[in-house]
Protein backbone atom coordinates (compact mmCIF):
# COMPACT_ATOMS: atom_id res chain seq x y z
CA UNK A 1 0.00 0.00 0.00
CA UNK A 2 1.31 3.41 -0.96
CA UNK A 3 0.92 5.94 1.86
CA UNK A 4 1.01 9.64 0.98
CA UNK A 5 0.82 12.83 3.02
CA UNK A 6 -1.13 15.70 1.45
CA UNK A 7 -2.29 19.13 2.58
CA UNK A 8 -5.53 20.91 1.74
CA UNK A 9 -5.90 21.61 -2.00
CA UNK A 10 -3.10 19.19 -2.91
CA UNK A 11 -3.82 16.39 -5.35
CA UNK A 12 -3.01 12.76 -6.01
CA UNK A 13 -3.11 11.48 -9.58
CA UNK A 14 -4.01 7.88 -10.41
CA UNK A 15 -3.17 6.93 -13.96
CA UNK A 16 -3.93 9.51 -16.62
CA UNK A 17 -7.53 10.26 -15.77
CA UNK A 18 -8.24 10.02 -12.03
CA UNK A 19 -7.53 12.95 -9.73
CA UNK A 20 -8.00 12.96 -5.95
CA UNK A 21 -8.08 16.40 -4.30
CA UNK A 22 -7.84 17.03 -0.55
CA UNK A 23 -10.70 19.48 0.01
CA UNK A 24 -10.68 19.92 3.79
CA UNK A 25 -9.10 18.46 6.92
CA UNK A 26 -10.87 18.82 10.27
CA UNK A 27 -9.75 16.75 13.22
CA UNK A 28 -9.85 13.09 12.20
CA UNK A 29 -11.95 13.70 9.07
CA UNK A 30 -10.60 14.34 5.59
CA UNK A 31 -12.90 15.57 2.84
CA UNK A 32 -11.73 14.51 -0.62
CA UNK A 33 -12.90 15.15 -4.15
CA UNK A 34 -12.62 12.50 -6.84
CA UNK A 35 -12.49 13.50 -10.50
CA UNK A 36 -12.77 10.40 -12.67
CA UNK A 37 -14.33 9.47 -16.01
CA UNK A 38 -17.95 8.27 -15.90
CA UNK A 39 -16.80 4.74 -16.73
CA UNK A 40 -14.93 4.54 -13.40
CA UNK A 41 -17.24 3.66 -10.51
CA UNK A 42 -16.30 5.34 -7.24
CA UNK A 43 -17.92 4.16 -3.98
CA UNK A 44 -17.39 4.61 -0.28
CA UNK A 45 -16.37 1.22 1.11
CA UNK A 46 -19.49 0.76 3.25
CA UNK A 47 -21.75 1.53 0.27
CA UNK A 48 -19.80 -0.88 -1.94
CA UNK A 49 -20.16 -3.64 0.69
CA UNK A 50 -23.91 -2.96 0.88
CA UNK A 51 -24.20 -3.28 -2.91
CA UNK A 52 -22.26 -6.55 -2.84
CA UNK A 53 -24.48 -7.95 -0.06
CA UNK A 54 -27.64 -6.98 -1.96
CA UNK A 55 -26.29 -8.61 -5.13
CA UNK A 56 -25.51 -11.83 -3.25
CA UNK A 57 -28.97 -11.84 -1.64
CA UNK A 58 -30.62 -11.29 -5.04
CA UNK A 59 -28.64 -14.17 -6.51
CA UNK A 60 -29.83 -16.50 -3.74
CA UNK A 61 -33.45 -15.34 -4.19
CA UNK A 62 -33.25 -15.86 -7.96
CA UNK A 63 -31.88 -19.39 -7.63
CA UNK A 64 -34.65 -20.29 -5.16
CA UNK A 65 -37.44 -19.34 -7.58
CA UNK A 66 -39.40 -22.33 -8.79
CA UNK A 67 -40.58 -21.28 -12.24
CA UNK A 68 -42.79 -23.61 -14.27
CA UNK A 69 -41.34 -24.89 -17.50
CA UNK A 70 -41.87 -22.38 -20.28
CA UNK A 71 -43.28 -23.50 -23.60
CA UNK A 72 -42.68 -21.52 -26.79
CA UNK A 73 -45.50 -21.52 -29.29
CA UNK A 74 -44.40 -22.19 -32.84
CA UNK A 75 -46.00 -20.08 -35.56
Curated annotation (Swiss-Prot):
It is found in: Cytoplasm. Keywords: Bacterial flagellum biogenesis, Cytoplasm, Repressor, RNA-binding, Translation regulation. Pfam families: CsrA (PF02599). GO terms for biological process: bacterial-type flagellum organization; mRNA catabolic process; negative regulation of translational initiation; regulation of bacterial-type flagellum assembly; regulation of carbohydrate metabolic process. It comes from the Bacteria. Signal peptide: none annotated. One of its GO terms (molecular function) is mRNA 5'-UTR binding. GO terms for cellular component: cytosol. PANTHER family: CARBON STORAGE REGULATOR (PTHR34984:SF1). Homodimer; the beta-strands of each monomer intercalate to form a hydrophobic core, while the alpha-helices form wings that extend away from the core. Belongs to the CsrA/RsmA family. A translational regulator that binds mRNA to regulate translation initiation and/or mRNA stability. Usually binds in the 5'-UTR at or near the Shine-Dalgarno sequence preventing ribosome-binding, thus repressing translation. Its main target seems to be the major flagellin gene, while its function is anatagonized by FliW. This is Translational regulator CsrA.
